[in-house]
């Protein structure tokens, strides 16, 4: 494994959540609430990604279920190619715009050049999986974290 560029040091503040792409929030929700005892926040539509999002949490664990809300949602394409499963890892950052600039300076390819509104008042941006060993990553500025 290669050593990350020094520009990345200190950008993230830990894992924010793991996102899982699902065909149906209702079906997946039952598994996480019943079998795992997780609690859910209200479902929210995220226009920039054309998805419905259900955040589930338990202690320090946080999972985000993402369901496509339109045929042209990036998650629709993901599900068609890969089926349900882990969609992305999300990293908590203090300032999404500064994190984007630092990652660009370090040579990483970003999908988003500026923060976009995420669920529950967050600002988000995605890092292209070609820059991260095949893993889609999200930067999350969360005023509630």
Locations of the language-model features?
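Residues within well-ordered alpha-helices
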Residues: 28-29, 52, 99
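Vicinal oxygen chelate
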Residues: 2-11, 54-55, 91, 100-145
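Mid-chain, well-packed structural core segment of small domains
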Residues: 78, 82-106
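Conserved active-site tyrosine of GNAT-family acetyltransferases
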Residues: 28-33, 103
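Conserved short beta-strand elements that form part of the metal-binding/catalytic scaffold
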Residues: 39-80, 120-144
């Amino acid at each position: 494994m290669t050593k990350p560029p020094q520009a990345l040091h200190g950008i993230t503040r830990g894992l924010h959540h793991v996102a899982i792409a699902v065909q149906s929030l209702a079906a997946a929700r039952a598994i996480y609430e019943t079998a795992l005892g997780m609690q859910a926040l209200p479902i929210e539509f995220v226009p920039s990604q054309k998805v419905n999002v259900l955040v589930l949490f338990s202690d320090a664990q946080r999972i985000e279920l993402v369901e496509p809300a339109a045929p042209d949602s990036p998650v629709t394409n993901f599900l068609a190619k890969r089926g349900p499963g882990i969609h992305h890892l999300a990293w908590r950052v203090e300032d999404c715009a500064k994190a984007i600039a630092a990652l660009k300076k370090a040579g990483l390819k970003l999908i988003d050049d500026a923060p976009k509104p995420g669920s529950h008042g967050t600002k988000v941006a995605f890092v292209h999986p070609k820059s991260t060993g095949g893993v889609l990553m999200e930067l999350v500025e969360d005023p509630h974290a």
